[in-house]
C-alpha cells in the first residue's frame, strides 16, 4: 500500500518511522507546508524532496497513492480526512478525530456515505500493558468490576499548538485514557461531572489540570485526575490505574500490573477485612507489533482486504463525545449527560 503522509514534523516523526519499518507500506508522497521542516526531515529520513508537496490536492494529483495518513493539528482534520475520502482513499488520522465535535461528526458522515475506512490512531490501546489489563478484566478472575480510578501527572514542554489549546490535557492527552476506559469497560460514558484549572506556574494558555467523575452504563463509576504541568513524581504516559472488583483489585503503577484476590470474606466478624492471597505482579502480554506499528498493519489489512478495524471514526465518535462531555462539564460546572 502506498500512502501520502500529511504533516511530517512533530508527531509525524513517529509515522515516518512506522512506515519505513513496515514491509507492506511505502510512501507515495508527503505534504508539508513548512519549508524548513521539509528540508530537515528529507535529510533525516532520506526522503525525496520532489515528493514533498504543499497541499493534499497537489499530492493526490501528482501521485498514485492508495491511502492517506493525517498527522496535522486537530483543527485541520476535517479538511484533510474529507478530502482524502472524496478522492476515494481510506485515511488513518491522528487523534483526536477532529478539533470540534461538529467536525468529528462531519467526518463520520462522509465515512458512512462513502463506505471508506477512516481510522483513528488510538495507539494506547495497542500496548502490552493495555492488552494485559484488558485480558485480566475479561478473564473474570477478579469478578465483576465495580469502579475504577485513573491518575495521570506529567509536565511536558511541547511548544506549538498544544500550549494554545483551551483544554490541552483533556483533548490531547486524557483522550487516550478516556478511550482506554471505553476499551476496558466495554461501555460508553453516560454522565460526567468535571472541573479544570490552570496552576499559577503553568506554561499552557488553557487549563492543564482536571478532575472528573464519570458514570457509565449499568451504573459503573470512574474517577480521573490529571495534570500536564506537574513538577515531580510523574506517572507513566499510560497513567496509574486501580480497578475495584468483586473478588479483588487490579492495580497499575509505573507500567507494572499487580493483582490481589479476596480468598474469604469475614462477613460475620466485625472489623475484619477478610483473607487475601499474596500480591502478584502480572506478566505483560507479548505483542508482535505495538502502538503505531500495530495500527499501521491493521489499517493496511482493513483497507486492502476489508478486515475489521477497531477504532474507526464511527466507533471513535463515542470517545469524542466522552472527551467533549468532560470539557463541557468543566466549562459549565454542571453534570453533562450523554
Describe each model-derived feature in a short phrase.
Residues 1-47:
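N-terminal Rossmann-like dinucleotide-binding module
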Residues 5, 70, 93, 99, ...:
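Hydrophobic residues in well-ordered beta-strands that form the structural core
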Residues 14, 33-36, 283-296:
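Active-site loop of classical SDR/Rossmann-like NAD(P)-dependent oxidoreductases
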Residues 15, 34, 51-110:
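Beta-loop-alpha module in the N-terminal Rossmann-like domain of NAD(P)-dependent dehydrogenases
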Residues 67-69, 217, 298-338:
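C-terminal helix-rich "cap/oligomerization" subdomain common to oxidoreductases
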Residues 117, 124-204, 213, 333:
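Predominantly a Rossmann-like dinucleotide-binding segment in NAD(P)-dependent oxidoreductases
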Residues 178-259, 293-305:
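Contiguous beta-strand/loop segments that form the cofactor/metal-binding neighborhood of enzyme cores
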